[in-house]
From Swiss-Prot:
One of its GO terms (biological process) is symbiont-mediated suppression of host transcription initiation from RNA polymerase II promoter. Forms a double layer around the helical nucleocapsid, the inner matrix layer binding to the N helix and the outer matrix layer binding to the envelope glycoprotein. Plays a major role in assembly and budding of virion, by recruiting cellular partners of the ESCRT complexes that play a key role in releasing the budding particle from the host membrane. Condensates the ribonucleocapsid core during virus assembly. This is Matrix protein. One of its GO terms (cellular component) is host cell nuclear membrane. Signal peptide: none annotated. Late-budding domains (L domains) are short sequence motifs essential for viral particle budding. They recruit proteins of the host ESCRT machinery (Endosomal Sorting Complex Required for Transport) or ESCRT-associated proteins. M contains two overlapping L domains: a PPXY motif which interacts with the WW domain 3 of NEDD4 and a PTAP/PSAP motif, which interacts with the UEV domain of TSG101. A motif (dynamin binding) lies at residues 2-4. Belongs to the vesiculoviruses matrix protein family. Keywords: Apoptosis, Eukaryotic host gene expression shutoff by virus, Host cytoplasm, Host gene expression shutoff by virus, Host membrane, Host mRNA suppression by virus, Host nucleus, Host-virus interaction, Inhibition of host mRNA nuclear export by virus, Membrane, Phosphoprotein, Viral budding, Viral budding via the host ESCRT complexes, Viral matrix protein, Viral release from host cell, Virion. A motif (PPXY motif) lies at residues 24-27. It comes from Vesicular stomatitis Indiana virus (strain 85CLB South America) (VSIV).
Length: 229
C-alpha cells in the first residue's frame, strides 16, 4: 500500500515499503477466486496471526503503473456506450488470474472501454466492426478494500466471447499493473477515463462490478467489488 505522502509526492524519512516481493501464484492455477468467510478467521491458522484486519471505513491509497490494451470485435456496430459496457464487462467471466489484481483489472477494463475507438471499416477483419484502446501511465486509487497484496510487473492476457442481445463477438485484453513506490505525485485513476462517453459514472462502474461512492471533495472512492459481477 502506498502511503498518502507518496501519493502526494511528499518525502518521508526512513519510510520503506511494507510490501514483499513474493512471486504471484501460477496463472494456470484452476481454483475458486472468491472467498468470503462467514465467521471470524481463527488466529491459530497458519499465516493469519499477523493478518491485517479489514476495516471497511478505513480509506487507503494504492499507487501503481498500468497498461491496458483492448480489442473488441462485434458482429455489428455498437450504438451507445451502454452497449459497449454490457459487452466488455463480461471480460472476467470464469476468471482465472491473479486474485489480488482482479479489482484493479476491473477498473482497467472499465477504463479501456471508455477509450475505445472504431477501426476504419476498410481495415476491419472480414468487414466486421473492430474497436481498439491502448492506455498506460501512473495513477493512484482511493479505496476501502483493505490491505492489498504485492503487485508485480507481470502482464496477463484474457480473451472472452460475448453474446449480449443483438451483439456477438470477442474481447481481447492485455493488462499490466504493478506497484509504484516512487515519491512522485500521480493523478487519480479516474482522471484517465474518457468521461465524455457517459454521465452516470456510478451506474456504469457497477456494470463492471465496481461499487464506488463520492467523497465530500467530489472524488470517487472504490468502496468494494460486487460478487455478482
Amino acid at each position: 500500500m502506498s502511503s498518502l505522502k507518496k501519493i502526494l509526492g511528499l518525502k518521508g524519512k526512513g519510510k520503506k515499503s511494507k510490501k514483499l516481493g513474493i512471486a504471484p501464484p501460477p496463472y494456470e492455477e484452476d481454483t475458486s477466486m472468491e472467498y468470503a468467510p462467514s465467521a471470524p478467521i481463527d488466529k491459530s491458522y497458519f499465516g493469519v496471526d499477523e493478518m491485517d484486519t479489514h476495516d471497511p471505513n478505513q480509506l487507503r491509497y494504492e499507487k501503481f503503473f498500468f497498461t491496458v490494451k483492448m480489442t473488441v470485435r462485434s458482429n455489428r456496430p455498437f450504438r451507445t456506450y451502454s452497449d459497449v459496457a454490457a459487452a466488455v464487462s463480461h471480460w472476467d467471466h470464469m476468471y482465472i488470474g491473479m486474485a489480488g489484481k482482479r479489482p484493479f483489472y476491473k477498473i482497467l477494463a472499465f477504463l479501456g472501454s471508455s477509450n475505445l475507438k472504431a477501426t476504419p471499416a476498410v481495415l476491419a477483419d472480414q468487414g466486421q466492426p473492430e474497436y481498439h484502446a491502448h492506455c498506460e501511465g501512473r495513477a493512484y486509487l482511493p479505496h476501502r478494500m483493505g490491505k492489498t497484496p504485492p503487485m508485480l510487473n507481470v502482464p496477463e492476457h484474457f480473451r472472452r466471447p460475448f453474446n449480449i442481445g443483438l451483439y456477438k463477438g470477442t474481447i481481447e485484453l492485455t493488462m499490466t499493473i504493478y506497484d509504484d513506490e516512487s515519491l512522485e505525485a500521480a493523478p487519480m485513476i479516474w482522471d484517465h477515463f474518457n468521461s465524455s462517453k457517459f454521465s452516470d459514472f456510478r451506474e456504469k462502474a457497477l456494470m463492471f462490478g465496481l461499487i464506488v461512492e463520492k467523497k465530500a471533495s467530489g472524488a470517487w472512492v472504490l468502496d468494494s467489488v460486487s460478487h455478482f459481477k
